[in-house]
A protein has these predicted regions:
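PLP-dependent aminotransferase class I/II
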Residues: 32-33, 54, 202-280, 284-287
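PLP-dependent aminotransferase-like
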Residues: 88-146
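Active-site pre-lysine segment of PLP-dependent enzymes
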Residues: 110, 127-139, 152-176, 180-212
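Conserved beta-strand elements of the Class I
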Residues: 21, 74, 94-96
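Short loop-beta-helix segment that forms the pyridoxal 5′-phosphate
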Residues: 51, 63-85
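Short beta-strands and strand-loop turn motifs
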Residues: 118-120, 143-150, 176-180, 287-289
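N-terminal "arm"/small-domain region of PLP-dependent enzymes with the aminotransferase-like
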Residues: 1-49
Length: 295
């Protein structure tokens, strides 16, 4: 079986008999916060019960943290689960994705036989998105995926560009999915998020605990959307107990780890220029990314 996603440390261990120094998964280098680990241990007595399929306690905590009503929040088994649920709920015939970008968008779209149109970002412009992306959306496009900041380029679309793109999607009756899984690595993430645009029912914001909190193995993500009917369709598009009790407890605990988040952000801000300079000293071209990865 061919795996397109990074982080396949088990295959490396089976082949070479040791663990890899894995640069394929851009997860917090500080590991799982102790408060989250303790929350998982404390939740173990609940392991003999089915988890809350509506993630009510976690959604209440997310509502407070994000400033978004609970009714506009859906939790899933990682952001990838929600990407697939969105595609299965909408069943788009044609979708637009940038290139390069996260591979799971196209993988999900392939499962419903959707035609994937790729908008190739300009390397001479350091792969930065421009108004040309807005122009690529027409009435034949049912869904657009925008990774913000983009994986693997680390580039951001300006808030004004995202607003233009959403306006165009509204005109074309197109769903815009903005993936903000890496956005919270930025100290000024609040200035870049698409949350102020959530009143538009055409916008879905994808987020996850995976990267920032070092929780890739826990599998926990969530999405924000102003269209509650679409969220209900996404809820029923997959299996009902997608988020375990342990993951729900971990997520609620992670939201309290503000000092940990500050430490991760400070570490990335210090080390990004160091790594950039080192790679350039080797003669490599490095794109000035904004998150915790470099292309």
């Amino acid at each position: 079986m061919e795996l397109v996603h990074g982080g396949d440390w088990m295959s490396y261990r089976e082949r070479f008999g040791r663990d890899a120094l894995d640069f394929s998964a851009n997860v917090s280098p500080l590991g799982l916060p102790e408060g989250v680990a303790q929350a998982i241990r404390d939740a173990l007595p609940l392991a003999d019960r089915y988890p809350d399929p509506l993630c009510r306690t976690l959604r209440a905590a997310l509502s407070r943290a994000e400033g978004v009503p609970q009714e506009r929040i859906l939790c899933g088994n990682g952001a990838a689960d929600l990407i697939f649920r969105l595609v299965w709920a909408v069943k788009p015939h044609k979708a637009l994705v940038t290139a390069p970008t996260f591979a799971e968008y196209a993988s999900a779209l392939d499962t419903v036989g959707c035609e994937v149109k790729r908008f190739f970002l300009d390397e001479t412009n350091d792969f930065a998105p421009t108004d040309a992306l807005v122009d690529a959306v027409d009435e034949s496009i049912d869904m657009v995926f925008l990774c913000q900041p983009n994986n693997p380029t680390g580039q951001l679309a300006s808030p004004e560009l995202v607003k233009k793109l959403l306006r165009r999607c509204g005109e074309c009756r197109t769903i815009l999915a903005v993936d903000e899984c890496f956005l919270d690595f930025l100290p000024d993430a609040d200035g870049w998020t698409a949350k102020p645009l959530l009143e538009s029912g055409d916008l879905v914001i994808l987020k996850a605990f995976t990267k920032l909190y070092g929780m890739a193995g826990v599998r926990l993500g969530y999405c924000l959307c102003g269209d509650e009917t679409l969220l209900e369709k996404m809820q029923t598009a997959g299996q009902p107990w997608a988020v375990s009790s342990l993951a729900q407890a971990a997520g609620a605990a992670a939201l309290k780890e503000t000092a940990y988040v500050d430490e991760v952000r400070a570490l990335i801000a210090r080390q990004r220029p160091v790594l950039t300079a080192g790679l350039r000293a080797l003669g490599l071209r490095v794109i000035d990314g904004k998150a915790n990865d470099l292309l």
